[in-house]
Structure formats: C-alpha cells, structure tokens
Amino acid sequence: MRIIFAFLLFASFSLQAQEKKPGKPKWRIDKNKIITGSLVLVAGSAKGFNETLHFNYKAFENTFPGINENWFNPQVSWRNKYKGGDPDNGPKFFLSTSAFVMFTDQYHLNNFINRAAIMSALVIKIGEGKKPFKHYLLDLLFYTVCHQVGFAATYYPFTARSSK
C-alpha cells in the first residue's frame, strides 16, 4: 500500500492541472501562402506581359521575331473578336466580345489569367480564419512582393531592351 501511495504522490508532482497556454501565433510562409503567393505571382506576370505588349511591343517583337502579330500586338489583335476583323460585322463567334474574349488575343488572355489567379488566391485565403492584425499587414507585404516579382520578370527585361 505504501508503494502505491508513494507512486501516486510522485505521479501528482509530474501532472499539471492547467493546460499550457499557447504562445502568440507567428506569421510563417506555410503551404497556403506558397500556393496563394504563386497564384499572385502568376497574376503579376500576366499584368507585366500585358504592359509589355501595350507599351513595349517593339522590344517584344525584336526579342521574338516572327511572332504572330494578329495574336500578340494589341493595336491589331483587338479586331480578332469580330468577323473579318471588322466591328461592323459583329462577333466572330458566340460571346467573342464578352465572356469568351480571352480566346481572341493575348491581351485579353492575359487579363483573364490575371483576374483568375487573383480571384483564386482570394478564395483560398478566405477560409483561413481570424488572425492578429499584424499578420494581415505581413500578408499584404508578402503578396505585394509576389505580384511585383511576377510583374518585374515579364516587364522590365523589355523596357531595358527598348531603351537601348
């Protein structure tokens, strides 16, 4: 009996009556942020590609000679959504001027990719739950950097070529 009593006495010293209070949650780059950050990077790349096509098309054309101007050049490709390239003839195919415009030229495809990637990242982030305000600020900084890296990767190489 004394052995059991001694065992229970020693066991009680090692048991805790209260749960440990979890420490402050730390901001980390987890799987969720990698996925959503990648989507935002793709959105930034699409935006940078659009800006390149719109403002530095000559440098883009010099870098990729022989490209299809009817697909890539926004000054020409906007006509792809119309029959015979003439707005007076009406749409080239059903919803080619609205819902399916992304299938008519690169400029509209880039816009679609940009919006789809941003919206996908947003939908994934909505399910995360509450967190400290500081984490929202860090998320804002993280996603801004992701977007700018994507933008810079597809825009600045062509601005450097066009200034030469």
Listing of model-derived features with the role each one plays in the protein:
Residues M1-P25:
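Bacterial Sec-dependent N-terminal signal peptides
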Residues E19-K164:
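Hydrophobic alpha-helical membrane segments
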